[in-house]
Structure formats: structure tokens, C-alpha cells
Amino acid sequence: MSRFFANGSDSESESSEEEVQASNFNKANNFQFSDDEEEVKRVVRSTKEKRYENLTGIIKTIRNHKKIKDIPNTLSSFEDLTRAYTKALPVISKEENGITPRFYIRCLAELEDFINEVWEDREGRKNLSKNNSKSLGTLRQKVRKYIKDFEEDLARFREAPDQESDVDEGEGEAHDSDAERAGADSDGGIGAGTGKLAELPKAAKLVPTKVAADEDDSDDSIDWDSDTESETESSEDENLYQNMRERFLKRTTEKEDKDDDKRKDKRKEQKHKVRKRADDDEDGEWETVVKGNVVEKPKMFEKDAEIDIPLVLAKLVEIMSARGKKRTDRRLQIDLLFELRDISEQHELGTPISVKIHFNIISAIFDYNQKISEPMKLEHWALLLEVMQSMLKLLLANPEINMNESVAEEHEEYGAAPYFIRGCPLAAVERLDDEFTKLLKECDPHSNDYVSRLKDEINVVKTIELVVQYFERCGSNNERCRIYLRKIEHLYYKFDPEVLKRKRGELPAAGTAPSSVEVMDKLCKFIYAKDDTDRIRTRAILAHIYHHAMHDNWFQARDLVLMSHLQDNIDAADPSTRILYNRMMANLGLCAFRQENIKDAHHCLVDLMVTGKPKELLAQGLLPQRQHERSAEQEKIEKQRQMPFHMHINLELLECVYLVSAMLLEIPYIAAHEFDARRRMISKTFYQQLRSSERQSLVGPPESMREHVVAAAKAMRCGNWQACANFIVNKKMNTKVWDLFYESERVREMLVKFIKEESLRTYLFTYSNVYTSISIPSLAQMYELPLPKVHSIISKMIINEELMASLDDPSETVVMHRSEPSRLQALAMQFVDKVTNLVDVNEKVFDMKQGNFFQRGNMGNRDRGYNRNQNNQGGNWGGQRRDNRNQRNRNQRGHHKQQQQQQQQQVQTIEEE
């Protein structure tokens, strides 16, 4: 045996018994640690450690994917994470009492923040690839659905997120458990001589980690300390080994474990400091970090400079000269203007200079957002409103100040009254109004943000009212028309219930503020008289009609439409004016329906509904189209033309009113012209809905609004007014449609009345050939109508020659006249017409196939005639056969006409008998 494997003791005074024991111990160690020669360390882990290690590994993968914005792999890793958490649920419920680990909640919170950040970056989303964009939408939906089960845990986490990294905590727990297990294995494998190895990890747990005062300490100092500690402990380690082989075997030592613990503690400490520093920064204000050297804020004036109006104006020109240039700090420009305003107010330089600075601040705020199509930030919006109202109040409080865009800069006057300032408050308020519309379009209409933004309309209207007061004092007619139109556009779509109450006499007309209808009349009449442009007058007329229709002034609205001839030249108007025209026609149709003018309501709505695109025509959304039907630029322009959500007209209400009006007109017309082959369709859309329902083999109970109207139409065709009314007026239809009207109960009563009247007309048209006479009181009882109303309906039908009958007043009956053909006769006549048309069509097709359209003696076709003659050996047999066939067809046609005349004569003789 080599001396290398001899006893590790150097003393020669040991006994032979000790040598035997050492040799036996050496054999046992050789057998027991045979795996160590392959440098493999067996570790037995619990189920909890396996599951937690799997979760932490996937979380690290997700974090790496998020850093490089690899969204598809983030999606797949998130799916793996949910599956791993599902597997770990039994362990969590057993070990953690069902409490979700904090590192898992942190991962979900970070993932949600990452998705929200990417989703809110609209420009970045546009640049994403198709795969990334699709994966982002899928990931967003899955995460939002998944975290609903962890809402309480996420809320608690977001209240106190400044704790140690949970993934590191999970690793620390796993490491501690591995160390404990290593100690247990050493107790069982090595024996009592290595008992200190089992105690060292526990001692390492109990010793707290020292926090270095200097943040620049690195891991090198830790390694240096660990090396010095290892030298002092080397003598103790030598006593733990019984032979030289065990000492020099490669293994994971206690020193290495201790060094790893120190490094990990150091990393945890540094991460905790960084996170705490970031949280402290969040408590303060945000600062813009400028690339390169930090530029100091320029000084406004010299220390001993005398502040006067020319100096302030020169500084104002200097600040505004950088407007629109590249690399201009727009935020700094706004701050400098505010500082200049404060300086001018401190030195009491006068109101005119303050107004001038206010106007330049407004221009600078507008310039901050370089992309005109995008809305401005909310902080700038609030600042803009404040500065605008402050400037207008100064202008109204000082009548000697005249602010106009026609004033040249060299003619501005700030020293003595009257003051002249170059600027246009009208253009500023128009831009303000446009920015308000952009803000509304950008918000989700079903969120609280939209409601918050809509509350700003009060301030916008106040600002417009201030401009109206200013231009009524010193403005031209053109400027007044422009600002009046802005006020009209904020007023025309709003319903004022006091107008209807005054109309009914519920409110006194005198001694109260003017109603919205009176204000609209005043503004619109001024525009009608003073406007020089067709566009402002056209939009004012459309808004005026819309407002009249909102308040049930049907005749005034109708007269304005007819006298203005808008329908003749609206095609030449701009798109926004055409959209306003469509909105006006839709609201006019609703007004006609409420005022019991069913035919007028149908005429107003038919152009909108027959196209199948009322949503686009009213600018309330875009319909999905094919790839090449609309370019990206066109779609962007159309989105800018969309109306804000609070100005939308309910499309289901429009369609229901249109279909009900069509039903009340179409069903009696179909019954009156049942056997007329050439009858026209009043409403193509309604007719298609009715025919598609009739083609179905099995029709269930109605569910949608369209199905209710179709079912009501079928009931009306049979004269069953009660079933028809139940389909139109019920709880579901009330919720969807009729409750949207202002006086819904009156509308429902009007509907039931019209259903009774039109059902009566349909019944008389359908069953008039069955009766010889009908009692008017029985009809009144059947349809629950007053007797004079039934008498009036039947009289109108007789006068218009719709019903061949006469009234017998003494007996109160309707006597039917048998002038119209019976059902069999009408069908026979219809059959003859169709057969005749079919014969004519067949003859034309046959003649075209045989070439009968060539004229005889056509010299341009000599060659073909010569060849045909050669083939027929000088005889024109084909032409003779064709002439004979044509003669035979003419004879047959004459025979059919004779038969038709004979049938008509027979019908007349039967009727006379």
C-alpha cells in the first residue's frame, strides 16, 4: 500500500489497535464516498423546494424576456408559469396555509406593469411586428383574466412593494434547506467526527449580515475576508479528517458555502438599497435628464438691469424667436414665459404687456405637442384653460385694450390708451375647442376618464362665452359668426326639457332665463343675415333644424329643410358638413315618428338605412373593410372625423324606428296589391328581413329587435293587432328602444294606436273578397277603436279607391262590391302574363343563337353567304327553315293573344251575370 493512503497522523507512538481501527475506517470511507471521485454530490430535495425552484426559474426567464421585449416568448413563459403554479398549489396549501408566495405576486405585478407600459406606448405598438402585436394582445387578455384571482394579494403588494426581491428570497430559502440537508447527510454519513459540519450552516443563519457603510464596497473585500478566515480555520479542518485521501478529495466545503452566502447577502443588500433609492425618488418630482452636460437655466435679466416695457418686450421676442426651431426646449420656453409674466406683474408694467405674455404662453403650449393629430397632455390642457380664461378676463376688464390679428407688430401700443396688441383670441379658442374634441376621442367612452374630460366642457363653454362677449363689443361680423358657430356646436345637440314644459304651459314663459331654443334662434338668425361664407350658414341651418327636431318642433324643422334646399347641394359640401346633414336627417326622422308622421319618418331615414352603413354615415365608428378598400392614411383621416361618444345617436333606436315605420306602410300595401306582379317595394331593407324570415323552415321566438319587428309584421298580415302590439311593445323592447325617448309612455300609446289602424286596413284588404258586407260596430269592437275613427278609415279607403265598397249609414255596414277579380281569376291572369313573357324571352334567345340578327342582302357578309351557298349546293335550305320557323312562331303568338282576349271576355261576362 502506498504511504499516501497511510494514516494521516505523524506521531509514531500510536498503538497497533489504532492502526487497525484506522484501516477499517479507511475501507468504509472508500466504499461510502466512491461517488465523490466523479465529482457528483447527491442532494435529496423536498417537493416544496422542487416546485419553488421551478417557479423562480420561470420568473427569471420572464424577466429576461421582458428586458428585450420578447413578447412571444414572454407569453409562452407565462403559460409555463401558470401551469407550474397549478402543480405547486397542493404544496402551497399545505406548507403556506394557502397563502400565495410573495415572489409570485411580485412577478404578476411586474408583468402587469410591463404590459400596461407597452400597451400605452401607441407609437411603439405601431412599430411592433405582426407576431409581437398579436402576442401582446393575447398576453394582455390572459394576464388580465388570470390576475382576477389575485386582486387582494396584488393590492396588498402594491401598498408595500419595497421589500426584498422575492425571487432571491425563494433562492435563499432553497439554499438554507440545502444546507440543512447537507448537514443532516453529514451527520449520517461521516459520523461524530464531522459533527461541526452540521452545525456550521445553522450558525451561519443566526449570524446577521453586516451592512457596509460605504456603498462602493465590492465582493473582493468579502473574498479577502473569507480567505483570512479560512487560514485561521485550516488547523481545525485538519483534525476533522482521518486520512490524507479524504482531505484532498474535491468537494463542496463549508468555506465555499459560507462565501456563497456572503455574496448572495451582499447582492440582496445592494438590490434593496437600489429599490429603496428608487422609491425615494418617486416621492419627489420628476426631472428631465438632458443628454450631455447639464445646461443651466438662462438668466432672465441682469442683476442691476432696470425692468421696463421695452426690455420685457425684447426678452419676449428673444424667447419666442426660438419657437419652431430644432432642439428647442419647449418646456423651458413655457417656464421662461411664466417667469417673464411674474416679473412684469411684480414691476407693474401694465395690463397690456401681461395680455401679450398670456397670448404667447398660449401659443407656446399649443406648440408643445408637435403632432397635431394627437391630443395634448392633461397637465398642459389644464394649464391652457387657466391661461386662456385669465387672458380673456383681462381683455373684458379693460375695454381700452384692442387685440386683433390685423394689428402690425410695429404698430403695437403698450404705453398709452388705447392699447393695440397683435393677436387673435378667436383662433386660440377655436384651437382650444379642437383640442377638447381630441381629448374626448382619445379616451375610452365607457371609462371614468371620459366622464372627467367631459366635465371640462363647462370650462370650454365658459371660455367661448367670454370670447363671445369680447367680440360682441369690438369684433367684426365675420368674427362674430365664427364664434357664434362654435357656441352653436356646443348647444345644438343638448335637450332642454324646460322647452316642452313651457310649450305645455307647465312653466311660466315670462320672468325666466331664455331657453336654448330662443338662444339658438338668436345666434342662427344673426348668421343667416351677416355671414358671407356658405359653410357657416349651412352648418348653422343644419344645427338649427337638429335643435328644433330635438324639441318636437316638427313643422319649423321641416320648413327650414324645404326652404333651404339643402338636399340639392349637400353633395358639394365638406365631409364634416355632410356628417352633420346625416345627423340632422336622422334626428328629423325621430321627430317625425314622435309626432305621428310615419311616412315622413320613413322618408327621412330611408337614405341612411338602405346603405347598411349608418354607423359610418353618422361618424360613430368605422366598419371593418378589406385590406385594399381603405388605406392607413384614409383610416386615420376618418378617425379624426368621428363624433365624440356623448354626441352619438343610438343606432338600434334608429333602425327600430325605420323598421316599424316600414312595417306600418309596407304590410297594408302588400295586402292591397297581393296579386299585382308589378308592385313596388316601399322599403327594400324591411322586405329583405321579411323574406329571409319566411324562408326559414323553423322560426323560434323573437330575441333581437329585428326579429320582434318581423314577428309583428307577420301578425299584422293576418289582422291580429294584439299579437302585433305585444311583439312591438314589451319589456325587452321597452328597455332596448322605447325607454330612450323623452316621453316614452306617449310614444308607446301612439304605436299601439297606429298598429290598430293599420291592422284594420290590412284586414279589410285581405278578407274583402270573403264578405258581402261588414258591420262597422263589430270592426270597432274587434280593434278597440272609436266608431268615428273606424268610419273615417273606411271612408278614406273608399275615396282613394283602395277598397271597392260603399257605406250604408242607416245599418252602419260596409257593402262590398265584386268588381275586382276573384283569387282564382287573379292567379290565372298572373299565370298568363308570366307564360307570355317566358315565350318572348325564349324566342329572343333562340334568334340570337341562330344568327337571325343579320339582315338579308348584307354586302359586308358576302364571304360567309358564299360559303354557305357552296355547302348547300346552291340552295338556301337553312334560310328557308328559319323563315318557316319564324312564321310559325308569329302564328303561335297571335293565337296566344286571341286566347287571352277570349279569357278576358269570359271574365267580363261572368262579372256582368
Curated annotation (Swiss-Prot):
Primary gene name: eIF3c
Chain ranges of the PCI domain: 645-821
A cellular-component GO term for this protein: eukaryotic 48S preinitiation complex
Biased composition (Basic residues): 264-276, 887-898
PANTHER family xrefs: EUKARYOTIC TRANSLATION INITATION FACTOR 3, SUBUNIT 8 EIF3S8 -RELATED (PTHR13937), EUKARYOTIC TRANSLATION INITIATION FACTOR 3 SUBUNIT C-RELATED (PTHR13937:SF0)
Function: Component of the eukaryotic translation initiation factor 3 (eIF-3) complex, which is involved in protein synthesis of a specialized repertoire of mRNAs and, together with other initiation factors, stimulates binding of mRNA and methionyl-tRNAi to the 40S ribosome. The eIF-3 complex specifically targets and initiates translation of a subset of mRNAs involved in cell proliferation.
Keyword flag Protein biosynthesis: yes
SMART domains listed in its UniProt record: PINT
Predominant localisation class: cytoplasm
Protein name: Eukaryotic translation initiation factor 3 subunit C
Location in or out of the cell: Cytoplasm
Assembly, per entry: Component of the eukaryotic translation initiation factor 3 (eIF-3) complex. The eIF-3 complex interacts with pix.
Source organism (scientific name): Drosophila virilis
